[in-house]
């Protein structure tokens, strides 16, 4: 957004509209390491079982092979508190009430130091992260990506929550357990519609089945500006080109679930393979059909292929 003044102006503009601003920050991934950042691998990086420094690979978007020289360094959970202390001292000067946590709800790893007093296992790491997220939640309204269980109590909004199964070949049916737990308690969304592997009607059906909100990653500049950069995964975000899709998805979800929001799931049934019925607390029932064949729900009611029907009560 440019300068500090531009960010503060954007925050005031959104506040006047009643829209929350959640600038995103990664605390566990070190995307930049200049002289002023003071990140030293031998002091601050987590260690694997072989004592080498751990990192996250960046994968080629077409081949999904790791890209040489594009590894992202990681921060040891033991160092998290001091980094957050430093961040808050600077961030609080902007007067922004929201904050988006990009990786604290997604990543969990150990730090296998030789010194047992400095070793951090995964259980300890989860406890450290939960403690720091709780501290952030006392000062800011939090949007959390991923939503691991130990950060759920502190989230106002969840994004990139798991709505779809991973597609394992031996799995023939899934149950939306995560949405059943969080629906009605916190506003949540899955992957952005325009960046998800599941697009179009399948994405829409999943929103109607789970009560999740539509979620998009949008930019005002053309997507080709991100080519050959660290942001090349934002390959379909140009708002003028996908505006029609954005409005279509929002309007359709609002037409079905708008009167039931927040959409609290109270029952979920698998009527047939890839045909599911969800009942919401309002009495609204939605039957979704992910298959390529119509599903005969009753003598006079058919759920179209890759479609849905909406029932209110017994009607």
Stretch-by-stretch model annotation:
Residues 1-21:
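Aromatic-lined substrate-binding rim segments of carbohydrate-active enzymes
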Residues 27-315:
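Active-site-proximal substrate-binding groove within the catalytic cores of carbohydrate-active enzymes
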């Amino acid at each position: 957004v440019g300068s500090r003044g531009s960010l503060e102006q954007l925050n005031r503009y959104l506040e006047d509209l009643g829209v929350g601003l959640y600038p995103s920050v990664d605390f566990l991934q070190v995307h930049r390491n200049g002289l002023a950042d003071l990140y030293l691998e031998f002091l601050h990086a987590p260690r694997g079982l072989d004592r080498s420094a751990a990192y996250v690979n960046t994968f080629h978007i077409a081949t999904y092979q790791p890209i040489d020289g594009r590894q992202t360094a990681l921060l040891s959970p033991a160092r998290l508190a001091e980094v957050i202390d430093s961040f808050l001292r600077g961030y609080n000067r902007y007067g922004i009430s929201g904050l988006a946590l990009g990786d604290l709800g997604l990543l969990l790893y150990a730090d296998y130091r030789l010194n047992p007093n400095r070793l951090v296992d995964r259980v300890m790491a989860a406890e450290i992260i939960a403690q720091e997220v709780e501290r952030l939640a006392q000062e800011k309204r939090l949007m959390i990506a991923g939503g691991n269980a130990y950060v759920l109590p502190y989230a106002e909004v969840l994004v990139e929550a798991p709505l779809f199964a991973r597609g394992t070949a031996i799995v023939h049916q899934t149950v939306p357990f995560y949405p059943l737990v969080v629906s009605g308690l916190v506003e949540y969304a899955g992957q952005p519609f325009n960046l998800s592997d599941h697009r179009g009607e399948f994405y829409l059906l999943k929103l109607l089945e789970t009560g999740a909100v539509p979620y998009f990653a949008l930019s005002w500049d053309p997507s080709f500006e991100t080519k050959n950069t660290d942001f090349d995964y934002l390959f379909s975000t140009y708002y003028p080109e996908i505006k029609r899709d954005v409005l279509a998805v929002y309007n359709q979800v609002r037409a079905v679930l708008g009167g039931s929001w927040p959409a609290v799931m109270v029952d979920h049934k698998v009527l047939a393979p890839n045909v599911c019925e969800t009942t919401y607390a309002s009495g609204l029932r939605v039957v979704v059909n992910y298959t390529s064949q119509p599903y005969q729900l009753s003598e006079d009611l058919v759920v179209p292929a890759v479609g849905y029907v909406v029932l209110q009560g017994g009607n």
